[in-house]
Amino acid sequence: MPLWLILPLSLALILPLGENATAALKEIPLPEPRLSGSMSLEEAIATRRSVRSFRKAPLELHELSQLLWAAQGITQGQAGFRAAPSAGATYPLEFYIAAGSVNDLPPGLYKHKAQGHELTELAKGDFRSALHDAALRQRCVKDAPVVIIIAAAYERTMARYGERGIRYVNMEAGHSAQNVCLQAVSLRLGSVVVGAFNDESVKRALSLPQNENPLYLIPIGRP
């Protein structure tokens, strides 16, 4: 067969694969987040502690939904503004979920989509053990029914603010992580922020894109 026929054919076999892989990803709608709770903000701030021991009890899907809404939920629909401030509304953060024990959600790796407030299933299986190894074998990472991973694509903010954008991204990650921790308290859940991990090991375990860097692991469960 002539080369000019072979080349387009080989490209046709390769290119649709990525498109089909993306199209095949399962989208899971999350329950609508509530805008009022039984605990005041002041009480949540006063009660928050780092919790590293969790009972063997699953989370509910509506609880995970609420936690992710607190992290980066859209709070102003028309403009798309979110629960945590972002420099120039550049939104450099991505939120991944290593789910091990969540009712109505199979174990797997998921990514939160703020638009539409839904999860994209990236892979099936329990990723907590791999994260546990990457996080210097901290037991809370393995024992928590769910681990939220905050990753950052720094270039989204640096494209607008240059080197100063690095600081803005790190600030935003802190805002989001604190929102998650306070929301966990409001739900009578325990959480702890983990920064002691090998970045490359986390990236490999979750197959993160090359331009994304993990900043936080947040194990969450019932104390």
Language model features with spans:
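N-terminal amphipathic, basic helical "cap/leader" segment at the start of enzyme domains
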Residues: 20-144
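Short linear sequence motif anchored by a di-proline
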Residues: 18-21, 202-205
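Solvent-exposed coil/turn segments that connect beta secondary-structure elements
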Residues: 72, 100-102, 114-115, 151-155, ...
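Small-aliphatic-rich amphipathic alpha-helix that forms the alpha element of a beta-alpha
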Residues: 48, 67, 95, 146-157, ...
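Bacterial N-terminal signal peptides
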Residues: 4-16
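A glycine-rich helix N-cap at a beta->alpha junction
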Residues: 207-223
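Conserved hydrophobic/aromatic beta-strand scaffold that supports enzyme active sites
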Residues: 109-111, 147-149, 217-219
